[in-house]
């Protein structure tokens, strides 16, 4: 008999849905289909796309496209620009879930390396929505100094090292308004896996040592870590097999099953999983999920994960062939069954922008 459990509305605040000029990697229908197959109600899309979401016109283009194609609820980030787009904030802030600032190398050309420009964006973002940052190593300390000065609610994405966990633990003890996210690939894999996976285990931040991985699990236990986020970032097999493979791996359909596997192994409680993928992101973004929203999971379902059967367009995963325990059987949004355990039932356009201007 299945061991079924009902989970509340899940939120992934860190995804790259691709679409638009990158629709060959994934489009807003295929990747939100991956979201509902992974149990999610809501996903928040990053701005490093083509065109990059750095101005009101590009933002409206993306809003229109996601609105027409999404099968789950959604939001999009506006991107901070190295060329200084702070003058646009008044025009876009009401339509987005937050501001994204890239402070280390990543996919796309959105890196802000100039400390003065980073500070200008911190000073200008006064809209009560989180400022989310890609910061690694010593850059984490630099961003914390801006948090300390401007007191902006700041979310640190995909933290991957023991050093960073230490900095952020101290910052939390200081009372700074920060939250911390980690990704499943950093929790389950190390640099040894990248050597075997090659480019299919290549992402930013990259995989780290076993000691770093263990520090992330320690951060979950100590509550330095608030959120587990997928950093879903699909690319085609051909791109990953090229001479210059891009960063990123898909993750929307493996995040919850991996966490449920940790529950089965006694590494996490189910309540802690719910905090990491539902309660904490809802609290940070001030979200009240609609009635009739959540997913049903079979906690005892044991199976070999087959990436060829996934909803994401790229049809591969660094976790392909891994034995998992815990499977999404149904996902509901606003009382509607959007995923039945095998097929996506919602039609493109069903998903709503939770941050739509009212």
Each model region followed by its residue ranges:
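Short glycine/proline- and charge-enriched loop/turn segments
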Residues: 14, 194-202, 239-244, 312-315
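Histidine/acidic residue-rich metal-binding segments in metalloenzymes
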Residues: 87-228
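Divalent metal-coordination and catalytic microenvironments
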Residues: 14, 35, 39, 74, ...
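His/Asp/Glu-enriched, well-ordered alpha-helical/loop segment
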Residues: 138-141, 146-151, 221-228, 233-297
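C-terminal cap of metal-dependent C-N hydrolases
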Residues: 292-355
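Metal-associated gating/positioning segment near the N- to mid-region
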Residues: 4-69
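A glycine-rich helix N-cap at a beta->alpha junction
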Residues: 64-80
């Amino acid at each position: 008999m299945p061991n079924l459990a009902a989970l509340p509305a899940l939120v992934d605040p860190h995804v790259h849905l691709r679409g638009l000029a990158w629709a060959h990697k994934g489009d807003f229908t295929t990747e939100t289909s991956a979201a509902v197959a992974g149990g999610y109600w809501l996903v928040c899309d990053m701005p490093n796309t083509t065109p990059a979401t750095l101005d009101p016109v590009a933002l409206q283009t993306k809003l229109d496209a996601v609105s027409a194609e999404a099968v789950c609820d959604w939001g999009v980030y506006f991107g901070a620009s190295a060329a200084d787009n702070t003058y646009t904030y008044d025009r876009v802030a009401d339509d987005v879930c937050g501001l994204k600032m890239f402070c280390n190398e990543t996919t796309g050309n959105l890196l802000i390396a100039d400390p003065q420009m980073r500070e200008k964006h911190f000073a200008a973002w006064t809209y009560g929505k989180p400022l989310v940052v890609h910061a690694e190593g010593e850059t984490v300390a630099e961003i914390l100094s801006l948090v300390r000065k401007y007191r902006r609610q700041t979310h640190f994405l995909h933290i991957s090292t023991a050093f960073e966990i230490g900095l952020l633990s101290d910052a939390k003890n200081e009372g700074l308004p920060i939250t911390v996210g980690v990704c499943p690939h950093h929790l389950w894999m190390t640099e040894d896996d990248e050597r075997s996976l090659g480019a299919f285990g290549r992402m930013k931040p990259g995989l780290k040592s076993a000691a770093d991985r263990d520090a992330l699990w320690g951060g979950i236990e100590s509550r330095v870590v608030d959120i587990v986020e997928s950093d879903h970032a699909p690319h085609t097999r051909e791109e990953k097999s090229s001479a210059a493979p891009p960063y990123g791996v898909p993750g929307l359909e493996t995040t919850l099953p991996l966490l449920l596997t940790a529950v089965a192994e006694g590494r996490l409680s189910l309540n802690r999983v719910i905090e990491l993928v539902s309660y904490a992101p809802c609290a940070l973004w001030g979200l009240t999920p609609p009635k009739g929203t959540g997913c049903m999971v079979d906690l005892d379902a044991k199976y070999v994960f087959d990436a060829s059967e996934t909803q994401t367009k790229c049809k591969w995963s660094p976790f392909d062939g891994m034995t998992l325990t815990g499977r999404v059987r149904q996902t509901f949004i606003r009382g509607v069954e959007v995923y039945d355990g095998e097929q996506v039932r919602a039609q493109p356009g069903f998903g709503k922008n939770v941050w739509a201007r009212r």
